[in-house]
Amino acid sequence: MAENNKKSTAYIQRMRTLKFYQKMASARIPITVYLHDQREVKAEFGAIDSSESKLAVSNLQTDWGVINRAVIRTGDVVGIEYNLVQEEGEL
């Protein structure tokens, strides 16, 4: 019984995570990515791979200019800052 409860909880958590990523990708949410080298870059969230090891972004603002599309390794990321607008009826 406890094993089924753990699986159910894991399923619910995974579905929440997927819905979160889906909402961010569909809204093209502007993000600030904080990197290990104490840099921060701004971009628009595009997608994340299933192992959550690569972050796809667009309009990546760097010291060298704006890169239309890029992939950031999540191992290089310290944190990501974003604002989500709550839709009516959401908790």
Curated annotation (Swiss-Prot):
<dbReference type="GO" id="GO:0000387">
    <property type="term" value="P:spliceosomal snRNP assembly"/>
</dbReference>
<dbReference type="GO" id="GO:0003723">
    <property type="term" value="F:RNA binding"/>
</dbReference>
<dbReference type="Pfam" id="PF11095">
    <property type="entry name" value="Gemin7"/>
</dbReference>
<keyword id="KW-0507">mRNA processing</keyword>
<dbReference type="InterPro" id="IPR020338">
    <property type="entry name" value="SMN_gemin7"/>
</dbReference>
<keyword id="KW-0508">mRNA splicing</keyword>
<dbReference type="GO" id="GO:0032797">
    <property type="term" value="C:SMN complex"/>
</dbReference>
<dbReference type="GO" id="GO:0005634">
    <property type="term" value="C:nucleus"/>
</dbReference>
<feature type="domain" description="Sm">
    <location>
        <begin position="18"/>
        <end position="86"/>
    </location>
</feature>
<dbReference type="GO" id="GO:0120114">
    <property type="term" value="C:Sm-like protein family complex"/>
</dbReference>
<dbReference type="InterPro" id="IPR047575">
    <property type="entry name" value="Sm"/>
</dbReference>
<comment type="similarity">
    <text>Belongs to the gemin-7 family.</text>
</comment>
<protein>
    <recommendedName>
        <fullName>Gem-associated protein 7 homolog</fullName>
    </recommendedName>
</protein>
<comment type="subunit">
    <text>Part of the core SMN complex at least composed of smn1, yip11/gem2, gem6, gem7 and gem8. Interacts with gem6; the interaction is direct. Interacts with gem8; the interaction is direct.</text>
</comment>
